[in-house]
Amino acid sequence: MQLNPDVMDIAACLDAEREAGKVRGPLHGIPFIVKDNIASKDNMETTAGSWALLGSIVPRDAHVVAQLRQAGAVLFGKATLSEWADMRSSNYSEGYSGRGGQCRSAYNLTVNPGGSSSGSGAAVGSNAIAFALGTETDGSGE
């Protein structure tokens, strides 16, 4: 959905800290992404996949994001999702949002990964990212 425009600067800072002997925690320098309905206070929007929330900048990190950053993890970006985390209707394709389009499997572009956290799952499943956060609304965690 979107990449953190500051990710390279953040990673360079963490690399310098490690070289100086400082390690923030067990996830120091490990990249992760979050589903685009999870708040992160940086230069990315939190839109839940909807054009209606374009420009939405939240005032603070979600608690889980703050904890991961404190442990040294690097927020690489936001993953696509089913618009509004699947809370619109049951009559549309899972993994689709107006803003991000249809999420596809990295191994078979004709396959819908399913669930509202499809972008997070597809990214981890394709080994594009070490780990990702999703949310359970209507089948994502199954």
Enumerate the language-model features and the residues they cover.
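Gly/Ser-rich catalytic/binding loops embedded in alpha/beta enzyme cores
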Residues: 1-138
